[in-house]
């Protein structure tokens, strides 16, 4: 990390810790406010090919309690060993009053000389640090502007209106999958869930080595993992793709990122061994470190990244970028029965930044169990979803083949013509293709409905929810997509109400239910575009016409029933029909 980026990130982290501690809010309460970071770079008058940079970090609201400048310098300077610059804090003589622009007295300024390439790298590192903050503190906003020789660029970082998930460890995580993928290479024509679904592991106690134990802290240091696949596998096809990569995000107390922007940082050394905490062989995976992380991306940059390869080192068809990525969030926090002072939290962050690898190595067994359990559960759910999709595909083929056998075996040209017109198909082959597409689209929509979640939810550790989640998921899927044959399922449909014409009804797809006119079939299959009111009136009209047609043509009763079934296909599969 370049020295300017290091200074900015450390100062931001210090201010947020101070902000949180002075506010005195309960654990898990989100900070709400805005910080401004501005860099003004002009050609240096003293150093050739260099830019003289003035960096200002300010709050647009009064930071609780203000800052003690001497204390700030005393605590921040040891964290900036490579920064030979003068730090200045805005005068607090005027109290907490704000000027017309809304800038509060909390304003830190320092100056450095950088070359243009280093400054560009600094800006990218700062942006990624801000992105890592807002996926945990989504109510915080950051305004970041850079002016180089008069040319200004500005960007605002925030996630206040994005979907979040409240974890049981007090962390609120942004779960919109766009935050974690930049240019996805998977097939986006397949339906997918727009959110990740993290599984929280149980907290693992951490032991601080004796040589590093002089922290003065009374409490317990713990690591809590959260694992998720991105994008959600509920949207994948029935093919079980291998995990393509693993991204690890490191967070310290108060949900603030640990500074480890490159693989040479001491805090990430323990992760160079890809199998140190996770046994990839049990998933038939071979992971290698990915040292080529692109800073110029809009997604959140992980602290550690692995990519999947074949054991021979060659990428195979099954080990490609089309599989999901495994996201692994590691939250290191301090549990104490007494309030922890700001200086202690700041010191703990400094300790973790320098010695995280040693601390995790000291507690390898418990950390490994915690991480492995979270990954195992994600993997099991992934396999379960893929198998469910396979059952869906098999059921669709049975349904389509059953309907096609009736259509192609019919000797009534008017029956075949009406069926083709219902789906706007030119021939039976196109009818089968469109029918399968309708089945697939709407069942996929039904399947994804179960992975939707509220804007903010609570997630408890996997040991408490594993059995219940799996049970509920099996129950939901069984209700929507039973494994029995189409004929057996349709035999149950008369319970919802079907006309009694004094004869035994068709058993191929079951008895007819509420009907809608043939012309409405195409409109109805557009998922949820047709209102329930309109569908109800169409059903009543169709019911009367069906009775009249059957009375006029007794011999064609079976095929009349089939006409009604074909015209009603989309309503039968429409997600809103069963809700």
From Swiss-Prot:
Ranges annotated as spanning the membrane: none
Compartment(s): Chromosome
InterPro entries (UniProt xref): TopoVIB-like
Pfam families membership: DUF4554
Gene Ontology cellular component terms for the protein in this record: chromosome
Ranges of biased composition (kind: Low complexity): 538-554
Taxonomic superkingdom: Eukaryota
Primary role: Component of a topoisomerase 6 complex specifically required for meiotic recombination. Together with SPO11, mediates DNA cleavage that forms the double-strand breaks (DSB) that initiate meiotic recombination. The complex promotes relaxation of negative and positive supercoiled DNA and DNA decatenation through cleavage and ligation cycles.
Name the UniProt record assigns to this protein: Type 2 DNA topoisomerase 6 subunit B-like
């Amino acid at each position: 990390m370049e020295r300017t980026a290091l200074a900015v990130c450390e100062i931001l982290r210090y201010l947020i810790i101070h902000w949180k501690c002075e506010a005195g809010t309960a654990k898990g309460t989100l900070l709400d406010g805005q910080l401004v970071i501005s860099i003004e770079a002009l050609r240096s008058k003293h150093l050739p090919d260099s830019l003289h940079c003035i960096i200002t970090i300010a709050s647009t609201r009064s930071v609780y309690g203000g800052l003690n400048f001497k204390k700030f310098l005393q605590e921040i300077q040891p964290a900036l060993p490579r920064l030979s610059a003068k730090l200045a804090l805005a005068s607090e003589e005027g109290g907490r009053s704000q000027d017309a622009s809304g800038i509060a007295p909390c304003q830190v300024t320092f100056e450095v000389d950088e070359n243009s390439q280093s400054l560009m790298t600094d800006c990218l590192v700062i942006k990624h640090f801000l992105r890592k903050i807002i996926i945990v503190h989504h109510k915080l906003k950051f305004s970041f502007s850079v002016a180089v020789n008069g040319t200004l660029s500005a960007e605002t970082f925030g996630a206040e209106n994005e979907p979040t998930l409240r974890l049981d460890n007090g962390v609120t995580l942004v779960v919109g999958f766009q935050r974690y993928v930049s240019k996805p290479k998977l097939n986006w024509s397949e339906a997918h869930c727009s959110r990740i679904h993290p599984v929280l592991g149980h907290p693992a106690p951490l032991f601080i080595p004796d040589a590093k134990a002089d922290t003065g802290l009374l409490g317990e240091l713990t690591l809590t993992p959260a694992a998720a696949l991105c994008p959600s596998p509920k949207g994948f096809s029935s093919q079980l793709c291998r995990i393509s990569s693993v991204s690890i995000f490191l967070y310290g107390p108060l949900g603030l990122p640990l500074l480890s922007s490159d693989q040479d940082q001491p805090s990430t050394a323990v992760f160079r061994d890809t199998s140190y905490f996770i046994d990839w062989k049990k998933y038939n995976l071979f992971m290698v470190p990915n040292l080529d992380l692109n800073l110029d991306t809009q997604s959140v940059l992980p602290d550690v990244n692995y990519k999947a390869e074949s054991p021979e080192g060659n990428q195979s068809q099954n080990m490609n970028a089309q599989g999901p990525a495994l996201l692994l969030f590691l939250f290191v926090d301090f549990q104490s029965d007494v309030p922890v002072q700001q200086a202690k939290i700041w010191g703990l962050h400094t300790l973790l930044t320098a010695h995280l690898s040693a601390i995790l190595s000291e507690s390898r067994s418990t950390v490994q169990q915690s991480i492995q359990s979270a990954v195992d559960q994600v993997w099991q759910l992934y396999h379960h979803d893929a198998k469910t999709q396979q059952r869906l595909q098999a059921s669709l083929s049975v349904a389509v083949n059953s309907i096609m056998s009736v259509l192609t075996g019919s000797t009534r040209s008017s029956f075949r013509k009406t069926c083709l017109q219902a789906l706007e198909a030119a021939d039976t082959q196109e009818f089968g293709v469109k029918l399968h597409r309708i089945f697939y689209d709407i069942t996929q929509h039904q399947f994804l409905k179960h992975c939707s979640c509220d804007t903010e939810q609570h997630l408890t550790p996997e040991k408490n929810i594993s059995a219940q989640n799996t049970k509920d998921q099996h129950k939901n899927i069984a209700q929507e997509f039973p494994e029995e044959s189409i004929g057996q399922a349709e035999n149950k449909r008369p319970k919802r109400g079907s006309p009694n014409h004094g004869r035994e009804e068709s058993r191929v797809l079951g008895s007819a239910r509420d009907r809608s006119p043939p012309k409405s079939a195409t409109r109805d299959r557009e998922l949820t575009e047709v209102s329930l009111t309109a569908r109800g009136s169409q059903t009543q009209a169709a019911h009367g016409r069906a009775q009249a047609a059957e009375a006029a043509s007794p011999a064609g009763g079976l095929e009349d029933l089939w006409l009604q079934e074909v015209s009603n296909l989309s309503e039968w599969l429409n997600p809103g029909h069963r809700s």
